[in-house]
Amino acid sequence: MVDRSALSFEENARQVAEFKNICAPLGITVEAEFGQIADGCDYEEKRDEYLTDPVKAKEFVEKSGCDCLAVSIGEAHGEYTGKGPDIDFERLKEIKNLVDVPLVFHGGSFSGFENIAECCRIGTQKVNMGTDAYNYGLDCLFHDGRYQNGENIGARMAGDIMWPGYKERVMDYMKVTGSVGKNWIKIEN
């Protein structure tokens, strides 16, 4: 993932192209971001300013050579402090019709499973949802007796305690996105 979305169009495309030139011979794909993703805390002020322009997205993919593209369609990173997401599905459809690389949905956490499912139906092929998974993991940690009793829990043990929460939430997203059976995690009913 090469996030240069805060830079100008030209500089973003140029830097992503540099990464692509380094990574391609090694068989490494390059994901780029075009159109910034707001943070939940400034979502209402920044949402419209950050939206990806579909025509510019096509040009960006052509200039940068990226293998997949994260676009801004009204989502945010992290938890929303005000009003929740207002996803622009028509914008996503326009982008999907114009670009020929897989699309990525950053800020999946707290964007709503219905919104994510619709984005996947339209053509999004990757959804990032780290904050949501972290929260489920932390919930496991905070409810663990060893943590509650003040025991010294190192990073390794904390990770082991948090893993079931991560896994549970990732599996929820896999079901919503239609990814079950297309990955290494086995879901048991």
Regions found by a protein language model. Name each.
Residues 105-107:
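Thr-Gly-centered strand-to-loop micro-motif
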Residues 123-156:
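A hydrophobic, small-residue-rich beta->alpha segment in the mid-to-C-terminal subdomain
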Residues 2-101, 113-124, 129, 142-143, ...:
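Alpha/beta enzyme core
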Residues 144-189:
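Extended, intrinsically disordered, low-complexity segments
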Residues 109-115, 133-137:
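Small/polar glycine-rich anion-binding or flexible loop at a beta-alpha turn
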